[in-house]
C-alpha cells in the first residue's frame, strides 16, 4: 500500500470475509497538554511512518520502536533509534502506517492510520460506528476473548513486578454482556450554535471536546439508542446551551412491581433554572419512556425529582431503582446517585465467585470492608446462615443506611452495618473486635493500603480482594504476603469490555504457623 495522510484506519477483519474492511474516522489530536505550537504544526504536517507492532502497553495500545527501518520513509531518516511509540488501534505483529500525535523526550504516541500487512487474526470490525472518535472505549477492534486474556496477562505481570508472586491457581475469566452492558454513566452535553444541534455523549479520545454520537453500543440500549432523540430534545429547549451533563442510572425491571416501576433515571444538570416550557418538554419526553426525571442546578443537595404525572410520589428526594442477585434470592434497592457496578451480568457472576472463594460455613463470621449497598454482604449473610454473622463497613453514611434497608427488605437478620473512615485504624471499634473467620475487601481504585497496615489485627483465615485497579491490588498483595498470607487464586472479570479497564479478584489464605 502507498503511504497516506488520511486520518482513517482500515481494519482488516480476519474473522469475516478476507476482503471485508471497516473504516474508523480518527479526529485530530486535541490534547490539553499539547506540545509547542511549532511541534504541533510539524506533527500535523508529517507523513505517517511505517512500524511493526512488537507488543502491547497495559492500556491495550500497540508498542513499536524506532530503528532498523521502522519509523522511516524514503524522504525521512530518523535519529530516534530505540525510542518507543505507543500506537492506538494496533495489535501485535501488525505492520502499520502510524500518524504521530504526540512527541515527548522519552516516548511518542500515535494512531495506526492503516494496517499495511500481517493483520492480527484477532482483529475484528468494531461494532460501533463512532469507534476511533469517541473516547468511551478503545479496544473494539480486538476480539473480546482476546481482550480479557490480555487483561489477565496485565494482572499477572503486575503481581510479579510488585509482589514477586503468581497465584497457586488462575481463575477462568468472568465474562458477561459485552455490548449494551453499561447501566451507569455521565454523558456530556454541548449545544453547537453553528450546527444548530446538541451533542450528547462521551469526550473524544485525548480531548475535552465531545464526540458527535448518534448511538452508543456500550451503554444499555435503553439509553444507548436514545442518544439521537436526546440530542433532538435538548436542541428544542430554550436553555439548550445551559445543559451541561446527563447522569444516567438504570436498574432491572421487576414484573412484581406496580405499573409505576421506572427502571431508568436521568439527572439533567442545568446551569440555570429551566423555563416552564422546557420542563414541560422534558416531562413529555420522559413520561413517554417511563423514565425518572431529575434536575440538578448545583451540588448533589440541589437534585430535584420532577413529577411526570399526578400520581407520582415526591415525598422523598429520589425514586427507586432495583437489581437482583437471583442466585441468593436478593433484590437490591438503590437511588440514581448510589455507586453500583455498571455491568449487571458480570456483577451476578462476581458476587457468586467471591462467595465461593471464601468457602464459608454455617456459623462463621465475615467482615465486608467498603460494603456499599451490601452487594457482597447480603449474599455472604445467606451463606453463613442465622448462626453466623456479617459486618459491613462503608465510608458513606447514606450507603450504610441503604445496605441496612436492603437487608431488612430481604428478610436478613444476621448483618450489621457501620459507617467508618477506613483510611484510619478502626480496630478499637466494638464491631472490629468480634473475631472474623473471613474478610472481603472491595476498595476504590486507590486500593486498601491504609487498611493493610492494621488488617493483621482482624486475624482472618481467608481474604477475598475485589479490585478495579491491578496496580494497587499488586501493591496490597505484597503487604498481605509479608503479613503471612498466601495468594491462592487470582483472575480477571470483564466488567468494562472494549476498554483498557481491568477488574480483578484475588483470594488469600493465612499460612498456618
UniProtKB/Swiss-Prot annotation:
Q: TRAM domain location, by residue?
A: 42-114
What residues form the catalytic site here?
468 (nucleophile)
Q: So which domain of life are we looking at?
A: Bacteria
For bias kind Basic residues, which ranges apply?
Answer: 29-43
Metal-binding found in the keyword field? yes
Q: GO annotations under biological process? A: rRNA base methylation
Catalytic activity line of the entry: uridine(1939) in 23S rRNA + S-adenosyl-L-methionine = 5-methyluridine(1939) in 23S rRNA + S-adenosyl-L-homocysteine + H(+)
The record's GO molecular-function terms, alphabetically, read: 4 iron, 4 sulfur cluster binding; iron ion binding; RNA binding; rRNA (uridine-C5-)-methyltransferase activity
Query: Keyword set for this entry?
Result: 4Fe-4S, Iron, Iron-sulfur, Metal-binding, Methyltransferase, rRNA processing, S-adenosyl-L-methionine, Transferase
User: Which residues are involved in binding S-adenosyl-L-methionine?
Assistant: 341, 370, 375, 394, 421, 442
The segment annotated Disordered runs over 1-54
Query: For this protein, what is the EC number?
Result: 2.1.1.190
**Gene3D superfamilies cross-referenced by the UniProt entry:** 2.40.50.1070, Nucleic acid-binding proteins, Vaccinia Virus protein VP39
Q: Which CDD domains match?
A: AdoMet_MTases
Q: Indicate, by first and last residue, each region the UniProt record lists as having compositional bias (Polar residues).
A: 1-22
Per UniProt, [4Fe-4S] cluster binds at 128, 134, 137, 216
Instruction: Please report a single Pfam family linked to this protein.
Output: tRNA_U5-meth_tr
UniProt keyword annotation of Repressor present:
no
Q: Which family does it belong to?
A: Belongs to the class I-like SAM-binding methyltransferase superfamily. RNA M5U methyltransferase family. RlmD subfamily.
What is the documented function of this protein? Catalyzes the formation of 5-methyl-uridine at position 1939 (m5U1939) in 23S rRNA.
This chain's protein is named 23S rRNA (uracil(1939)-C(5))-methyltransferase RlmD
Q: Which organism is it from?
A: Psychrobacter cryohalolentis (strain ATCC BAA-1226 / DSM 17306 / VKM B-2378 / K5)
